[in-house]
């Protein structure tokens, strides 16, 4: 593989927060005869691994993207009631949170590879202990059913899941999945937290740090409105307000 293609692979791995599993795969193959990386390329991967670990600590503390809340107040009250119900099944609640986490990342960052992988791993290891009848009821109560169908289709199309592994899937192939999955190869893909607002001292005007990221977030909100309308609108304004919190008085 050419140096250019290795660079493309590294960019994709960094962008989708899967540097560690990709690097692990590279290490397992390094003994193969036709598999050759220069010392500089190995150093670049090791640097990317270190930066990914450092960034992960900051990234996971971002309360805005946590799965245990929704930005729509009405839906969030329903979610909290579900999570506070001690009689509900723990595995089913865990599955619900994984679906919400993927949905929130889709709205704010585009298709999230790492989060989809986590959902897929849980499905293959713990699906037998999930009450899918209750889960579907919760998803409909939270208006999440349609975007959950998109997640099912992405798992089948991108990661080779079979229909029998997707108890939630309604059997209807999503026609938009190829267009949605195109985000995976867009190097201009930007995260919602890549833009924030600031105000210079002595200046009454507020400006954004990354106009392209802000426009990307607007386009993403419009793209996924069909799948989760009740949350998409409030999520956009909540993200906007979250960005305003960076303003230095």
Describe these PLM feature segments.
Residues 1-249:
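Conserved NTP-donor binding/palm subdomain of two-metal-ion nucleotidyltransferases/polymerases, i.e.
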């Amino acid at each position: 593989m050419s140096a250019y293609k290795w660079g493309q692979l590294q960019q994709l791995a960094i962008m989708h927060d899967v540097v560690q599993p990709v690097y692990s795969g590279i290490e397992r193959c390094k003994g193969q005869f036709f598999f050759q990386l220069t010392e500089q390329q190995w150093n670049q991967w090791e640097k990317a691994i270190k930066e990914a670990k450092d960034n992960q600590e900051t990234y996971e503390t971002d309360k805005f993207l946590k799965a245990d809340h929704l930005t729509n107040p009405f839906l969030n009250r329903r979610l909290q009631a579900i999570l506070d119900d001690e009689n509900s099944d723990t595995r089913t609640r865990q599955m619900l949170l994984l679906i919400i986490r993927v949905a929130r990342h889709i709205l704010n960052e585009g298709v999230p590879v790492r989060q989809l992988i986590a959902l897929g791993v849980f499905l293959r290891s713990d699906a037998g202990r999930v009450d899918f009848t209750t889960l579907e009821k919760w998803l409909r109560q939270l208006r999440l059913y349609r975007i959950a169908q998109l997640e099912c289709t992405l798992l089948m199309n991108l990661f080779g899941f079979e229909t029998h592994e997707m108890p939630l899937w309604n059997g209807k192939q999503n026609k938009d999945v190829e267009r949605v999955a195109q985000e995976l190869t867009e190097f201009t893909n930007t995260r919602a937290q890549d833009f924030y607002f600031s105000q210079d001292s002595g200046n009454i005007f507020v400006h954004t740090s990354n106009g392209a990221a802000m426009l990307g977030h607007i386009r993403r909100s419009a793209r996924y409105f069909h799948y989760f309308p009740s949350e998409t609108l409030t999520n956009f304004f909540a993200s906007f307000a979250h960005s305003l919190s960076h303003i230095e008085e």
